[in-house]
C-alpha cells in the first residue's frame, strides 16, 4: 500500500554534508520540488527567507536559502527534539500533502509539490496566500490538483499525526509565524470537500 507517514522515529545525524553544486544535476522540476521545504521554513519561521522566494533570484540566493532553511530546522529541533510541541510546525503542509501524495500513489506529484498544495489550505491571510500562489506559478509548482476529497480524507486519517478524532494542524497567520491548532478530523473533511487548494 502506497501510504506516507504512518510511522516515525527520531535519530540525530552524526554529520550533515551540503553540496549545492549537486542540485544542479537535477531536472528543474526536482530541483524546485526540493526547495518547497525551504519555502515552508520561511512561511513558518523566517519571513526574510520567504522574501527570497518572493523577490529574490533563487539561483543567485541558493546558498542563503539553504543556510536560512537549515537554521530554521536546527533552531526548531534544538528546542523540541521529540516533537512534543514547537517541532510540529515543521509539519506545515504535510498533513494534507502526504494524503494527496498517497492518493496519487507517490508517483504523479512529487513530495514538495504535494506539501506546497497542503500549505495553501492553512495560510489564513488571503493576500499572503495569493503571494504564495504567485511564487508557485513562477516556479512551476501546481496550485491545484483534482482529487476525491473523501479518499484524501481517509488517507489523512491514517497519518501518524492523526490522534483519535483530532489532528494538529499548522496554520500560518502571517509570513514567518505559525500556530498549532488541534482540529477535529471532521473539520478537515469539510475543508477538503469545500475547497480544494
Segments from the language model and where they lie:
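A glycine/threonine-rich phosphate-anchoring loop and its flanking beta-alpha core
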Residues: 1-54
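C-terminal charged capping/lid subdomain of soluble metabolic enzymes
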Residues: 36, 130-197
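Active-site segments that bind and position negatively charged phosphate/pyrophosphate groups
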Residues: 51-151
Amino acid at each position: 500500500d502506497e501510504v506516507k507517514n504512518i510511522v516515525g522515529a527520531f535519530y540525530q545525524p552524526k554529520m550533515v554534508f551540503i553540496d549545492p553544486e549537486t542540485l544542479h544535476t537535477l531536472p528543474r522540476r526536482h530541483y524546485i520540488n526540493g526547495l518547497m521545504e525551504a519555502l515552508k521554513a520561511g512561511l513558518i519561521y523566517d519571513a526574510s527567507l520567504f522574501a527570497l522566494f518572493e523577490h529574490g533570484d533563487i539561483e543567485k540566493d541558493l546558498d542563503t536559502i539553504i543556510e536560512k532553511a537549515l537554521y530554521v530546522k536546527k533552531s526548531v529541533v534544538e528546542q523540541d527534539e521529540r516533537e512534543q510541541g514547537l517541532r510540529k510546525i515543521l509539519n506545515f503542509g504535510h498533513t494534507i500533502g502526504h494524503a494527496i501524495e498517497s492518493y496519487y500513489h507517490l508517483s504523479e506529484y512529487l513530495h514538495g509539490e504535494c506539501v506546497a498544495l497542503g500549505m495553501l489550505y492553512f495560510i489564513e491571510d488571503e493576500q499572503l496566500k495569493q503571494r504564495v500562489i504567485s511564487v508557485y506559478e513562477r516556479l512551476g509548482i501546481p496550485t491545484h490538483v483534482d482529487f476525491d476529497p473523501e479518499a484524501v480524507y481517509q488517507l489523512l486519517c491514517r497519518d501518524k499525526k492523526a490522534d483519535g478524532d483530532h489532528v494538529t494542524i499548522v496554520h500560518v497567520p502571517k509570513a514567518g509565524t505559525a500556530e498549532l491548532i488541534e482540529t477535529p478530523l471532521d473539520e478537515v473533511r469539510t475543508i477538503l470537500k469545500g475547497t480544494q487548494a
